[in-house]
Amino acid sequence: MSSRDAMLGRIRTALGRGPLGPDEAATVNAGLTEPARNLVPDRAQGKPQDLIERFIAMATEASASVDRLSDISEAPARISAYLAGQNLPKALRRAEHSLLETPDWQACSLFSVSTGATDGNDLVGLSVALCGVAETGTLVMASGPQSPITLNFLPDTHIVVVRAGDIVGGYEDSWDRLRQHMGASRVMPRAVNFITGPSRSADIEQTLLLGAHGPRRLHILLLDDPA
């Protein structure tokens, strides 16, 4: 017996319940395999192009900046221009994601690129989102070897690539996308982060402060590439 089975067994005993009957088990399995959909707001509905435009509008409203790419090979030059515009050094730490292996990062002069998780000493981090949520302009980040969670929180500037084909309508759709990402293994990531705009807080005297608990800048590279 696994530790999970033992724990669930103790809970059943405390509740005075025995094993699930066939009907109860079928109800539980149906809820897991085909979860019921909640009411879908208007902002989470629309054709793919409508959702993309809504994602851009909502992300911008949340103080993120958005730059559209036609090909991932454009990323180094666009990032270099963005860093120059923000008066930031041309150095970043990127996730070891397969999508980020394609560009020639040395094509831009004076561009220093390191890879992997950050220890907090990097000013700029580059990640790839699992998907984007049009309803609120939110990025969904699933932790893993190709997506270190530290890049989401420690660098002062967070740059995130998201494919246009990975823009979904609402939060329920993002969980569907996560299940697809998990595949047959059904193994959940250690963490799933929903990021809407830069980090902010107004705890002190109701004065809004960007970068209070994470990056003060969020720059999104929207890749016009079907997922």
Give residue spans per PLM region:
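The feature marks the mature, well-folded catalytic cores of soluble enzymes
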Residues: 1-227
